[in-house]
Amino acid sequence: MIIPVRCFSCGRVIASDYGRYLRRINEIRSEGREPTAEEIEKIFDDLGVERYCCRRMIISHVDLINEIMPFS
């Protein structure tokens, strides 16, 4: 659905980092390739997302809001 505002485990605000993360991932994908694990790690380091629980929240999020909207 929509990215949670805070990490479920530690309570850190992650919603503001999600948009910047997506932008950087989409820049890599616009080059016609998928991001490597090292590139994803560097993106998180640049954003200041250090804890693995916060990284998990961002990486595992699936944005389904556009698929659900037609049914409301």
Swiss-Prot record:
It is an enzyme of class 2 (transferase). Gene3D superfamilies: Homeodomain-like (1.10.10.60). It is found in: Cytoplasm. GO terms for biological process: DNA-templated transcription. GO terms for cellular component: cytoplasm; DNA-directed RNA polymerase complex. Pfam families: RNA_pol_N. Zn(2+) binds at C7, C10, C53, C54. Binds 1 zinc ion. InterPro entries: RNA_pol_su_RPB10, RNA_pol_suN_Zn-BS, RPABC5/Rpb10. Belongs to the archaeal Rpo10/eukaryotic RPB10 RNA polymerase subunit family. DNA-dependent RNA polymerase (RNAP) catalyzes the transcription of DNA into RNA using the four ribonucleoside triphosphates as substrates. HAMAP family: RNApol_arch_Rpo10. This is DNA-directed RNA polymerase subunit Rpo10. It comes from Thermoplasma volcanium (strain ATCC 51530 / DSM 4299 / JCM 9571 / NBRC 15438 / GSS1).
